[in-house]
């Protein structure tokens, strides 16, 4: 039952709090980004990195079940990238972040983006020590998506609607999507 998970989360949360203090001491903004596969996350990170180039120094930790091209695509943008392959684990945890942090030039960064594993079920309960949680909602995934993953959307500080250029093609109902977000993530800042 549940009792098995509680100690694991306790240890994780303690470590996450340590990370949080460490990040704060370095004035590092840490963003934990959640999305389903194919919702445009890596592309979005790429664009963000390009936009901020020369002004804000970004590092990225990419979580993935298996190695894949995400990290390669990002490292081409001259951004320090550390890939964490989680194997059978469907989420990143604070311990994995601790390992990745050792390989990241944290003193040279302003922003650390953690691209969580592409799935919205598991990661919601694992605190990584981030300052901001962003969850992506691609118009191609449908407006009821937040209702399917309430814990994830509820834990988000920011909900980002992606692939808006396809909204008409997929018949995306913006009002329904905003209503769904409002229902499960009423405190989240919605960006379209």
Language model regions located:
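Class I SAM-dependent methyltransferase SAM-binding "motif I" and its flanking Rossmann-like core
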Residues: 138
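Short, glycine/polar-rich helix-capping loops at beta-to-alpha or helix-loop-helix junctions
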Residues: 67-71, 145-149, 173-179
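Flexible active-site lid/hinge loop adjacent to a nucleotide/diphosphate
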Residues: 128, 143, 147-167, 177
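A generic "cationic amphipathic patch" detector
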Residues: 58, 110, 146, 169-172, ...
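The Walker A (P-loop) glycine that initiates the GxxxxGKT/S ATP-binding motif of P-loop NTPases
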Residues: 35
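Nucleotide-state-sensitive switch-loop elements of NTP-binding domains
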Residues: 2-21, 26-31, 39, 43, ...
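Canonical P-loop GTPase G-domain recognition
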Residues: 165-192
